[in-house]
Regions:
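Acidic, Ser/Thr/Pro-rich intrinsically disordered regulatory segments
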Residues: 110-142
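Conserved N-terminal/central alpha/beta ligand/cofactor-binding core
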Residues: 1-38, 43
């Protein structure tokens, strides 16, 4: 309420420049307090008593919560330094409610870069690319990190990569470095140029060219058609997702099939 916002290129809603996250949080808190909401801080949910009632603990010690209805909004397990330790599923397991283990969701991916790539290009962006994994695909930007890739083009395909890693132990990320051009158009741009001029002809930057050299056979860089095919489908082996503690969000917790129609 009373927070001026705008919609970014990603479709997400952001506060306008000059408004800090703490300001937004304060406005939300004020709105809730005006509606009679009471916020109790420094309380920890520690489990259930023998009657199935929630048990909490504060500086006075443990106590049982008496309520007609309790809504649990316990969060995931990313960024544990903020308090999201992810231990609550075990408390539900103890009363017979099944849960799925937490896994990283919106997160970076691990790729075993050759040392020269990581050293020379960590921190550099891969702009205006399309990435694909399984049936998922996304346009956007990815940043090369010391450990792999991260960014808004990567996060939408993480579920497909996670499935492949869990099922097969490995996964492949497909990158189209020039989604605005077909293979044929790229070949025409190269024309009769020498291989050493291929990258310049199609406007590849140094980071893009470094990835092509690292993950495609050298002989393919000598053929215009093969070089352009690799530009349109650069395949990178994904070894893992980045740790859950680095993830923006997580999946896991109580599955929908464990809930009744009234979410109890």
């Amino acid at each position: 309420r009373n927070v001026e916002t705008f919609i970014g290129s990603s479709g997400r809603v952001f506060p306008v420049k000059g408004i800090k996250p703490i300001d937004v949080l304060a406005r939300i808190r004020e709105h809730l307090m005006e509606r009679g909401v009471r916020i109790h801080v420094e309380h920890v949910f520690t489990g259930f008593d023998e009657a199935g009632r929630p048990v909490l603990e504060n500086h006075n010690g443990p106590f049982t919560l008496e309520a007609d209805r309790v809504i649990f909004a316990l969060g995931g397990a990313s960024w544990p330094v903020t308090g999201s330790t992810g231990i609550w599923p075990s408390l539900f397991n103890a009363i017979g409610i099944a849960t799925h283990p937490f896994e990283a969701s919106n997160c970076g991916i691990a790729i075993a870069w050759p040392e020269p790539v990581a050293k020379a290009h960590a921190g550099k962006p891969l702009k205006n690319i399309r990435v694909s994994a399984g049936d998922e695909s996304a346009l956007g930007e990815a940043t090369i990190t010391a450990h792999g890739l991260e960014g808004n083009a990567i996060y939408p395909v993480v579920p497909a990569l996670r499935t492949a890693l869990n099922e097969a132990g490995h996964a492949t990320l497909h990158i189209d470095l020039k989604p605005g051009n077909t293979t044929e158009e790229l070949v025409r741009k190269i024309g009769a140029k020498e291989p050493r001029n291929f990258a310049e002809a199609v406007h590849l930057d140094r980071a893009q060219l470094a990835l092509l050299k690292a993950f495609t056979p050298k002989e393919r860089s000598m053929s215009a058609s093969a070089f352009c095919e690799d530009i349109k489908d650069l395949r990178l082996p994904v070894t893992a997702l980045r740790p859950i503690g680095e993830a923006i969000s997580t999946v896991g917790g109580i599955p929908t099939e464990a809930l009744s129609s009234d979410f109890s």
